[in-house]
Every structure is written in structure tokens, then in C-alpha cells.
Amino acid sequence: MDWFHCNQCFRKDGAHFFVTSCGHIFCKKCVTLEKCAVCGTACKHLALSDNLKPQEKMFFKSPVETALQYFSHISQVWSFQKKQTDLLIAFYKHRITKLETAMQETQQALVSQDKELSVLRKENGELKKFLAILKESPSRYQGSRSITPRPVAITSPSQSVTPRPSFQHSSQVVSRSSSVESVPYREAGFGSLGQGGRGLQGRRTPRDSYNETPSPASTHSLSYRPSSASSGQGIFSFRPSPNGHSGHTRVLTPNNLAQRESRTTLESLPSFQLPVLQTPYQQQRQMGLPSGREAWTTSR
């Protein structure tokens, strides 16, 4: 220590030196007990020896040695703190990795839910539109479900009706009617039968306004007879010929026409053709019979 000397006489050699509380060094000759000889302040004195305390010895050591000692301590402190910091960083890195994985899964689920939500919104909009249409016109959809197509009987126009030669009248030809509504079955009286026949000839639909040629090969017959002179009602009787397969007779009167019309139509019968209506006077002239009410039959 080349810096060590007495602050009063500046000597370096000697065995006994003292240091004051005010920071001055004195040799044994220059030291004063009352006050410091350099600054004149009251102070305490401490004799320098090898038995000094560590906090007192540190002032007489080399700064490099003190620095190395402190650097070693600082390095230990820094290593300890760095180790703790590394552990904390590793924990945060692991946690960040887990959070990133969870975030990716959440994003995928969110995309899937967005697609499903868009589909549900589209379906909901369509259902709302359909519900609005149903609220506006509910009877139209209910009516369309309740209406079912009904079969329509169609008679081939190639089939024809042939009256008997003795009863055929060239001036009266009755066209086939397409439905039961176009045939007037009500007669005002037996005397107006000719007028009713002309009315049947006049009421024709455009599709059925053609004449048919009678055929002698017909197997069915149609007859008309008045029920009584006073009632003024006619009876149409459909009966097959002796060569036919059916053995029953169908009778249509103006009274039960409405009931028959609800169950079947005349066109549903096989090859139905309207008869040639004649007055009793014309029948008597053709047959050469005396006056009287007799049934007339038209072969089909």
C-alpha cells in the first residue's frame, strides 16, 4: 500500500498508526486524543492491526480485489436470477403454445358455426317467406290439396246407333251429347213430345255436333214410353238386346235424374247414343197402327 502515510508528518514506516473517525491517519507521535490535528474536529481514534473487523478492513484492501470479490458476488446473484427468469420464460412459452392451439381450434369452430348459422338463416328466411304466403292465402293451398282429378268416361265416336227401319225418320237426326246436362228429359206433356225431340236435336255441343249412322249390329236397345197421360213425365229404359250379356234394365225418370247424375253419367254407359224422338202420331203413321199410346223402341 504505497498510499499509506501519516497525515501530519508524512512518514510511511512505523509500527503503530491510528485512524480517526473523521478519516485521517496519524502516527504514534502526531496523534492527539482531544481533536483531529488536521481538521481540528473532535474525533475518535482506532489503532490499526490485523484484528480489525471486516467492515473496517475493507478500507485498506486493494480496489481490484474488492471489485473481484464483488463481481463474484454479483455473478452469483445474476446467475440465480437468470435461472429463475429462464424458468418463468419456459412456463410462459409453454402456456403460449397451449393458448395458440386452443385459439386455432376456437377459430375453426367459429368458422364452422358461421357456416351453419348462414345456412340456418337462409332456411329461416325461406320458411318465413313460405309462412307469409300461407298467411296471405291459406285457402288456396288447402283447396289445392283437397281437389283430386276425377276420371271422365269417353265414348268412341266410331260406335253408332241404328234405329229399326220401320221407326227411322229421315228428317230427324239426333246428335250424340257429351254430358247428361245437355239432354232435356223433362216433357211438358205427352202431346208436346215432338217439340221435345226437336229440342234435343237443337241442344248440341261443338265437339258432338256430328251425325252418326245407325248400325244394325248393335246389341243394346233404348226405349221411351210415357208413364201416364196425366203426369206428362217420360221414362227412358236402357235394356240390352236378347244377344247381349246383361239381363237388367236401367230406368231414368226426371224425378230421380238428380240422384243418378251424382253416381254415374250417361257417357259412362258403353256406347251410349240418344234415340230419335218421334211423336205418337208419327209412330202410328209408320207402323200403320190405330191411334193409341204405345212404347217405341230404338235398336242400338
Swiss-Prot record:
Q: Which UniProt keywords apply?
A: Chromosome, Coiled coil, Meiosis, Metal-binding, Transferase, Ubl conjugation, Zinc, Zinc-finger
Coiled coil, from the record? 88-124
Instruction: One GO cellular component term, please give it.
Output: synaptonemal complex
Q: Where is the composition biased (Gly residues)?
A: 191-200
| Family matches, as CDD domains | RING-HC_RNF212B
* Entry's Gene Ontology BP terms: chiasma assembly; homologous chromosome pairing at meiosis; protein sumoylation; protein ubiquitination
State the Gene Ontology terms under molecular function: SUMO transferase activity; ubiquitin protein ligase activity; zinc ion binding
Q: Where in the cell is it found?
A: Chromosome
Q: Where are the zinc fingers (RING-type)?
A: 6-40
Q: Where is this region: Disordered?
A: 141-251, 280-300
Its annotated pathway reads:
Protein modification; protein ubiquitination
What about PTM? Answer: Autoubiquitinated.
Q: Where is the composition biased (Polar residues)?
A: 155-169, 211-234
Q: Where is the composition biased (Low complexity)?
A: 170-183
Q: What is its EC number?
A: 2.3.2.27
Does the record bear Transport in its keywords?
no
Write down the chemical reaction(s) this protein catalyses. S-ubiquitinyl-[E2 ubiquitin-conjugating enzyme]-L-cysteine + [acceptor protein]-L-lysine = [E2 ubiquitin-conjugating enzyme]-L-cysteine + N(6)-ubiquitinyl-[acceptor protein]-L-lysine
> What job does the chain carry out?
Ubiquitin E3 ligase that acts as a crucial factor for crossing-over (CO) formation during meiosis. Essential for normal prophase I progression and for ensuring appropriate CO designation in meiosis. Recruits key components of the cross-over machinery either directly ou indirectly, leading to the activation of the MutL-gamma complex. The function of RNF212B in CO designation is dependent on its catalytic activity.
The record's section on PANTHER family has:
RING FINGER PROTEIN 212B, RING FINGER PROTEIN NARYA-RELATED
The UniProt subunit note reads as follows: Homodimer.
This chain belongs to which protein, by name? E3 ubiquitin-protein ligase RNF212B
Organism of derivation: Pongo abelii
